[in-house]
């Protein structure tokens, strides 16, 4: 299992320690949510998604030389939101995380997720 698979499996299964284990200490993290982001906020937001979602499914994955691009379906009790994530890997750790959420669906199906 490569580091991006481990990261993905860890956050989907709500394994905080697994996510932290593969994030580089100086990882660059960026997203389109309102809240400022650092590694701890990323872990907490992934926890909130994993805890609230009925299921999280990887619907697309493209691997490149230094990372992976993923698209997730985040199924909530009343509908589905989508998230794209771009992961860069350096020295066996996730060095960059870029997340793009469908904010209209997130507000509708995961209320309060990004206005913490």
Where does each model-flagged region fall?
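C-terminal and inter-domain tail/linker signature
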Residues: 1-116
